[in-house]
Amino acid sequence: MAYLDWLDRTLQAKLAEKPVGEPVALRFSLAATEDHGLLIPALARALSLASAWLGSRIERLYAMGSLHDGSVSVLAEPAGGQTAFVSSELSRGAIAVRLLLIGNHGTLIWEDSPGADGLKVDFRIEGRSEDQWLREALERSLESGDSEEVRRG
């Protein structure tokens, strides 16, 4: 199983217990080595996960940074009024995953360096159907320098 699929399954199970109440904000950061995929697909997948964890589809986003420099951050606005800040960067070091989920009754923090223990980790970035709409909005926002609506179908 790919790491991000495992993380999604693990976090969904934890969130079902309502440990933070209703999620209201999310900070999600991925630092992956260059051989694991491109920034835009990684960001689209991360935004799709953020949407699932917040329980609300992302309607609008603003991307900033540079593909050339290997670092892009996104401020996203889900339909439910929550806030998501997602970033992805290429790293010459180890893979790093950081997550801060803020709810109306607490916070959840997740930090991991998959593979740092020497075990092989499947860190493929596999796209989902929802990712395509997010990917297109990311590309438009980076090109325009402005926020963009996520246009579905």
PLM regions and their residue ranges:
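Interdomain hinge/lid region at the active-site interface
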Residues: A94-I125
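A structural signal for well-ordered alpha-helical scaffolds and beta->alpha junctions
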Residues: L4-D8, L43-L47, A94, D131-R135
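Short amphipathic beta-strand/extended segments with alternating polar/hydrophobic composition
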Residues: A84-E89, L108-S113, R124-Q132
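C-terminal helix-rich "cap/oligomerization" subdomain common to oxidoreductases
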Residues: D122-G153
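A contiguous active-site-proximal alpha/beta segment in oxidoreductase catalytic domains
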Residues: M1-H36
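Rossmann-like dinucleotide-binding domain that binds NAD(P)(H)
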Residues: L26-A96
